[in-house]
């Protein structure tokens, strides 16, 4: 099949891992000769990279698919692809539900997109959901940004949280070698990228599957070791990482983050619940006391560190008192940002089968109460920025105000200020903050520090 002058479109649902996978699959499609189309109705290949963490995201996928399936009856050459976690979970059942589909592929197969599409173009309907070793030879991604980039360091998850479908759809943990991670970062540095976010479902579990151990029995390749190994990559000014699991978040890692100047003082560590009984029912493997100690240790080493997290309300059996324990933890810690969600039963998870499910009304009420507190605490946390000078990495123009540029502080606060994006994109700018909101800042530039060129 000739792919020149043909177009593709990717719609991505869900987490940062999916966004990184979509960038790699876009790179594969462009290597094959396809051009990107913003409008799916003008595309010859439409790929939905899906999320199954919550039911609403899954239902949205089926809605999109229904529209394009109708179009395929009028345009038989249209190629429809479902990738990601819904594809992995449903497999061949997706073909029965949407027979117009050409390719169903789980997240472990993202790097095999070219081979799978060539099979489709040869006339086959393809399902690729079997467990595979993720290919280390990662195709050059089509990055959405020219300033910041994702770099996967570990795929999959070995945890068995009772509410979560991720281990079922993303497979067991597979760490990339330190050499492969550094090589990708070096290439990004040569291309002019300034900030790297290292990605993993449980990134602080990195290296447990790699060979070797220290004489003390510690894994030879921990995430802390990886940070030291990649920290001096030329051209890279900032390093972030996500997502961390409290079970593996050590003082050694915290100390490394405090010592390494490129590592940003921002930590995303989901706690899910502030009640020990619920944490045990969730099989999270820690207590709320341990979580508090982690945050206390971070703030001891880095008093101004930004903390973000995830929380679930309405987990099966959650009492009002248990929910209030979550509110207390949020009130005590004071998160800079908190991603909240009402519990959504997911197929194949233990908690979905439990009889003590809460009503949608109760879940909605608790979510609203939690979100109110989150906004109050975030606004309180923002006050510390007023009048301060913050280093901002400029990423893009403010879409709502063409006279402003936008970027993020080291603590991950979205920040706006007057400026020309053509002059400032990719630059580190000292900004004096004169306006604060719960989740963003506004200021005036006072100094531009030219980022190091390589």
UniProtKB/Swiss-Prot annotation:
User: Which UniProt key words apply to this protein?
Assistant: 4Fe-4S, Cytoplasm, Iron, Iron-sulfur, Metal-binding, S-adenosyl-L-methionine, Transferase, tRNA processing
Q: Give the organism, scientific name.
A: Trichormus variabilis (strain ATCC 29413 / PCC 7937)
Q: Which InterPro entries match?
A: Elp3/MiaA/NifB-like_rSAM, Methylthiotransferase, Methylthiotransferase_CS, Methylthiotransferase_N, Methylthiotransferase_N_sf, MiaB_methiolase, rSAM, rSAM_horseshoe
Q: What's a Gene Ontology MF term here?
A: metal ion binding
Q: Name one GO biological process term.
A: tRNA methylthiolation
- Judged by the first EC level, this protein's enzyme class is transferase
Residues holding [4Fe-4S] cluster 2: 157, 161, 164
What EC number(s) does its UniProt record assign? 2.8.4.3
Q: Which family does it belong to?
A: Belongs to the methylthiotransferase family. MiaB subfamily.
| The UniProt record lists the keyword Transferase | yes
Domain (TRAM) ranges? 383-447
Identify this protein by name.
Answer: tRNA-2-methylthio-N(6)-dimethylallyladenosine synthase
Q: How cofactor binds (record note)?
A: Binds 2 [4Fe-4S] clusters. One cluster is coordinated with 3 cysteines and an exchangeable S-adenosyl-L-methionine.
Q: Where in the cell is it found?
A: Cytoplasm
| GO terms for cellular component | cytoplasm
Q: Give the encoding gene's name.
A: miaB
């Amino acid at each position: 099949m000739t792919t020149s002058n043909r177009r593709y479109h990717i719609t991505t649902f869900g987490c940062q891992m999916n966004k990184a996978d979509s960038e790699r699959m876009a790179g594969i499609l462009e290597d094959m000769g396809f051009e990107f189309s913003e409008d799916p109705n003008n595309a010859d290949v439409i790929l939905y990279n899906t999320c199954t963490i919550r039911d609403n995201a899954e239902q949205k996928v089926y809605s999109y698919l229904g529209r394009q399936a109708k179009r395929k009856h009028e345009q038989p050459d249209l190629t429809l692809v479902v990738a990601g976690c819904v594809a992995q979970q449903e497999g061949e059942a997706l073909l029965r539900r949407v027979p117009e589909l050409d390719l169903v592929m789980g997240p472990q197969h993202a790097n095999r997109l070219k081979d799978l599409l060539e099979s489709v173009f040869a006339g086959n309907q393809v399902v690729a959901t079997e467990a595979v070793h993720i290919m280390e030879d990662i195709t050059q991604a089509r990055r959405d940004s020219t300033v910041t980039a994702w770099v996967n360091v570990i795929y999959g998850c070995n945890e068995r949280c009772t509410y979560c479908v991720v281990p079922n759809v993303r497979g067991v943990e597979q760490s990339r070698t330190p050499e492969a991670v550094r090589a990708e970062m070096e290439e990004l540095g040569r291309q002019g990228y300034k900030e790297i976010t290292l990605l993993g479902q449980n990134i602080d579990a990195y290296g447990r599957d790699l060979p070797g151990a220290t004489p003390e029995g510690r894994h030879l390749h921990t995430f802390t070791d990886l940070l030291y190994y990649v920290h001096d990559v030329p051209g890279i000014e900032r390093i972030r990482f996500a997502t961390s699991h409290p079970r593996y978040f050590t003082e050694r890692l915290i100390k490394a983050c405090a010592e390494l100047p490129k590592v940003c003082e921002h930590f995303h560590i989901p706690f899910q619940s502030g009640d020990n009984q619920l944490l045990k029912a969730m099989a999270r493997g820690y207590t709320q006391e341990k979580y508090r100690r982690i945050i206390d240790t971070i703030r001891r080493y880095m008093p101004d560190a930004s903390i973000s997290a995830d929380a679930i309300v309405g987990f099966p059996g959650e009492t009002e008192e248990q929910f209030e324990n979550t509110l207390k933890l949020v009130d005590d810690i004071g998160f800079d940002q908190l991603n909240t969600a009402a519990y959504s039963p997911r197929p194949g998870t233990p908690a979905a089968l439990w009889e003590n499910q809460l009503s949608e009304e109760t879940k909605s009420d608790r979510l609203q109460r939690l979100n109110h507190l989150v906004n109050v605490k975030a606004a309180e946390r923002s006050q510390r920025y007023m009048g301060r000078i913050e280093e901002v990495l400029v990423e893009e123009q403010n879409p709502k105000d063409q006279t402003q540029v936008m970027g993020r502080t080291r603590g991950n606060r979205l920040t706006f200020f007057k400026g020309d994006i053509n002059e400032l994109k990719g630059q580190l700018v000292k900004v004096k903050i004169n306006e604060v909101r719960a989740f963003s800042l506004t200021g005036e530039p006072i100094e531009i520090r030219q980022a190091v060129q390589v």
